[in-house]
Amino acid sequence: MGQKSNPIGMRLQINRTWDSRWYADGADYGRLLLEDLKIRKHIMKAIPQAAISKVVIERPAKLCRISVYAARPGVIIGKKGADIEKLRRALGKMTSSDVSLNIVEIRKPEIDSKLVAQGVADQLERRIAFRRAMKRAVQSALRLGAEGIRITCAGRLGGAEIARTEWYREGRVPLHTLRANVDYAEAEAHTAYGVCGIKVWIFKGEILGHDPLAQDRLMMEAQTSGVRPAR
């Protein structure tokens, strides 16, 4: 049942890979896993205005390599790199390994599911009508090259007494096709009436062949190409 399982989990080692890429056994596994959770929580809390999509953690040998994918990298780097150095020192205190921090710019945040979901959540918190927020996000994603997008909002939408679920979709979102490059994310909007949940599926085309690193490779190519999306 493609609609009831996480699209990213279904495609691991097909055209997606894990955000934590390391191997450990015994007592080290639990310790490193807890470190990863603390690192991600600290980054998200320290710089929420940087529009962070994901944090990838790799641990080759005695090194902890952290890659932060963000739409506004300048917020993380700061003036003359002061903020990124401060962040690196803070992360270094959370792990016994040497920390290497890399910032990857997301050139098209309109087709990044995490940023789209967070954008809709922010609009709901500012009391913008949920249908308008969903339609605006869908139109922006299709304009920037998405082949299909679906957004679901659930909760006391518009201050209604009874919670309900509303969704909006345009284009194709083939959840059962494993070669489909489907980006998925969730977000929460904390409104005056309670918490509303937002889910976003974005279909970006098909990836033929076995390529677990396809997502990261395409993102890095977009970063180095120097081509910015039309506004």
UniProtKB/Swiss-Prot annotation:
Pfam families: KH_2, Ribosomal_S3_C
rRNA-binding in keyword set: yes
Family: Belongs to the universal ribosomal protein uS3 family.
GO BP field: translation
Organism whose genome encodes this protein: Rhizorhabdus wittichii (strain DSM 6014 / CCUG 31198 / JCM 15750 / NBRC 105917 / EY 4224 / RW1) (Sphingomonas wittichii)
Role of this protein: Binds the lower part of the 30S subunit head. Binds mRNA in the 70S ribosome, positioning it for translation.
Name of the protein described by the UniProt record: Small ribosomal subunit protein uS3
Domain of life of the organism encoding this protein: Bacteria
SMART domains named in the record: KH
InterPro entries the UniProt entry points to: KH_dom, KH_dom-like_a/b, KH_dom_type_2, KH_sf_prok-type, Ribosomal_S3_C_sf, Ribosomal_uS3_bac-typ, Ribosomal_uS3_C, Ribosomal_uS3_CS
Chain ranges of the KH type-2 domain: 39-107
Record's keyword terms, sorted: Ribonucleoprotein, Ribosomal protein, RNA-binding, rRNA-binding
Subunit field text: Part of the 30S ribosomal subunit. Forms a tight complex with proteins S10 and S14.
NCBIfam families per the UniProt record, alphabetical: rpsC_bact
GO CC annotation terms, alphabetical: cytosolic small ribosomal subunit
Gene Ontology MF, one: rRNA binding
